[in-house]
Amino acid sequence: MKHMMKGHLNIAWKRSEFALERKGTSPIGATGRDRLMRNFVLQMGFGEPALAVLPRQYAALTFQPRIVLVSVVAGILLQSQALFAALGALLVWSALFPRPNPFSALYNLTIGGRPGAFRLGPAPAPRRGAETMAGAFAFAIALLIVAGFNLAAHVLQAVFLAASLAAAIGGFCLGTFAYHLRHGNVKFALATLPWAKNEKSYEVKGEHHE
């Protein structure tokens, strides 16, 4: 009996050691920042990221939102319909033609061209859905400025600015979140919020990349 108890204790200890090892190497059990980055990658429509490349992949995927954020701030300060229209055209182009995406091309030619950097390929459907939504916001703001509906333009600009900030530095993309909700992936959408700790796997409808 004593030997059996000792054997069970050894097995339990080995299992706990294995669990700790997995926790140290898995994005799920890592820091809150790692969890935020992992959830953002999944929300974008990509598969489970490896912890070793997670920071580089996250940085690559936030390159476009940061350019959009700078453009939105400039457009608001200048109240320029031309700037918002140009931004909208670039975003819709990126959604319709994901391979020649100008944002990804710029990243791959600069940061992505460095040794060991993560390179961007064609965007999955959730990311393209977010680009479409952002492009629609930009075009709507441009039209409102032209039409002289300043209050409505300011409201949309505030929403666009908040969404751009969330995607660029907050680990949350309103467009991809809305995409998953529209396609009935409610549990998955909630599980990929920046603060979510859910380790379960969900069947996701629609196109996703590994």
Annotate the PLM regions.
Residues 7-208:
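Membrane-interfacial helix-loop segments of redox and metal-homeostasis proteins
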Residues 1-5:
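Extreme N-terminal basic, low-complexity initiation segments
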